[in-house]
A protein has these predicted regions:
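Conserved beta-strand-loop-beta-strand hairpin that lines the nucleotide-binding pocket
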Residues: 7-11, 15-56, 86-187
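Core subunits and conserved enzymes of cellular information-processing
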Residues: 1-7
């Protein structure tokens, strides 16, 4: 069989230096609200490029600039408790899921909104319609219908995802282990 002379969408998204030329708004916007979302100031950093590089760069930026560890000493024991304002493993899982499951037909970027109180990841159009919100919040978001199966295969090869519906349970576990509030999922 002859090979197709045209690149596949997943190939452009992972291997072209500027996939946003073909898919507008393929980017991750990280927005910092130092006064909260209702404040008058914000700072933004926009990440573009091949999906894996863009995702890793956004995660590194978030980790370097916004994650803080607090050490709590206890009077009657030698071990201190260490907690993070936002656990990195949960953020990593959530952002990779957003890249994996977003619609590349939508002309909206993935947006990470950060304030002192919360970190919100917006990705459109949200979870697949076959996943109920109640199941998502309970960590039972098991769907064998993937919006972007080929993207998932590439992310799996890059050790960025497992592709076995483990993302939401991992986010819930990491948040609980850190002593963080249960994350809120909305559709």
């Amino acid at each position: 069989p002859t090979e197709s002379p045209w690149p596949k969408n997943a190939g452009l998204l992972f291997f072209h230096d500027t996939p946003e030329r073909f898919f507008p708004s393929v980017q991750i916007d990280v927005v910092w609200f130092p006064e909260g979302a209702g404040g008058d100031r914000f700072e933004e950093q926009i990440f573009k490029g091949p999906l894996a590089r863009m995702t890793r760069e956004a995660l590194g930026y978030i980790q370097r600039n916004f994650l803080r560890e607090t050490v709590i000493k206890h009077p009657h024991r030698a071990e201190a408790t260490r907690v993070w304002n936002f656990p990195y493993a949960a953020i990593e899982e959530a952002l990779v899921n957003a890249v994996y499951h977003r619609s590349y037909e939508e002309r909206e970027p993935i947006e990470v909104r950060i304030s002192h109180e919360e970190l919100v990841i917006l990705s459109f159009p949200g979870p697949d319609r076959s996943i109920r919100l109640e199941d998502l919040q309970a960590g039972r978001a098991v769907s064998r219908r993937y919006r972007n199966r080929r993207i998932g295969e590439f992310l799996k090869e890059l050790d960025m995802t497992e592709g076995r519906s483990t993302g939401i349970p991992k986010i819930l576990k990491e948040m609980a282990t850190n002593g963080s509030p249960v994350p809120l999922f909305e559709t």
